């Protein structure tokens, strides 16, 4: 079973529809026991870092997520919450992946938020990349990002380079929305769900 963490009342229709298309058995949940028993966990996120961390804390999920051994995927804000810190609201995050979510620099031809299609540049071989090309496009909507570093599986260029896909151990993050990224996004989600689980 796939646990989709639902603590903020966000509209998760696009994500759940994608999982239905993939034939995944999932539950929208904020129940700690259900999350711990899941084969895969997805942490979506829309809003601010403070609201996201507050929602996780109010539902008693911070320590739960920190101790998971199965694959965990953070999407958009969910990826940023996996980091050590966010400049948005100056708030500590889960600390599962080293790094800080920093505000993107706005330029004349690169407004913030970064919104729309942009391509991935894979840096490391990963099972997430199976069936994909180095020039595939995915859909972004964000103002904060992790600078490209050693944990980046894929990077993206938007005036400056940032991490688009990140991995440390069983923790994965995608700064873009795979559920809104057409066929490429479906391949990425399917590849994540195909990762071996310890549960």
Swiss-Prot record:
Q: Report the pathway entry.
A: Amino-acid biosynthesis; L-histidine biosynthesis; L-histidine from 5-phospho-alpha-D-ribose 1-diphosphate: step 5/9
Entry keywords, A to Z: Amino-acid biosynthesis, Cytoplasm, Glutamine amidotransferase, Histidine biosynthesis, Hydrolase, Lyase
Q: Name one GO cellular component term.
A: cytoplasm
Where is this chain's protein located in or outside the cell?
Answer: Cytoplasm
GO BP terms: L-histidine biosynthetic process
The parts of the chain that form a coiled coil are none
GO molecular function terms listed in the Swiss-Prot or TrEMBL record: glutaminase activity; imidazoleglycerol-phosphate synthase activity; lyase activity
Question: What sequence ranges are listed for the domain Glutamine amidotransferase type-1?
Answer: 1-199
What Pfam families does the entry give?
Answer: GATase
Task: Report quaternary structure and partners.
Answer: Heterodimer of HisH and HisF.
Q: What is this protein called?
A: Imidazole glycerol phosphate synthase subunit HisH 2
């Amino acid at each position: 079973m796939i646990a989709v963490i639902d603590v903020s009342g966000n509209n998760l229709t696009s994500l759940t529809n994608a999982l239905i298309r993939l034939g995944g058995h999932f539950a929208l949940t904020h129940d700690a026991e259900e999350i711990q028993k899941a084969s895969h966990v997805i942490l979506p996120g829309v809003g601010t870092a403070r609201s996201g961390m507050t929602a996780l804390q109010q539902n008693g999920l911070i320590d739960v997520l920190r101790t998971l051994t199965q694959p965990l995927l953070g999407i958009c804000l969910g990826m940023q919450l996996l980091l050590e810190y966010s400049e948005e609201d100056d708030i500590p995050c889960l600390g599962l992946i080293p790094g800080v979510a920093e505000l993107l620099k706005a330029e004349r031809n690169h407004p913030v938020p970064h919104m729309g299609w942009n391509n991935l540049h894979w840096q490391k071989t990963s099972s997430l990349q199976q069936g994909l090309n180095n020039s595939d496009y995915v859909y972004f909507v964000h103002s904060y990002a992790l600078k490209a570093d050693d944990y980046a599986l894929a990077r993206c260029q938007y005036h400056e380079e940032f991490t688009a896909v990140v991995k440390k151990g069983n923790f994965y993050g995608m700064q873009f929305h795979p559920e809104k990224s057409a066929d490429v996004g479906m391949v990425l989600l399917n590849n994540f769900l195909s990762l071996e689980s310890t549960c």
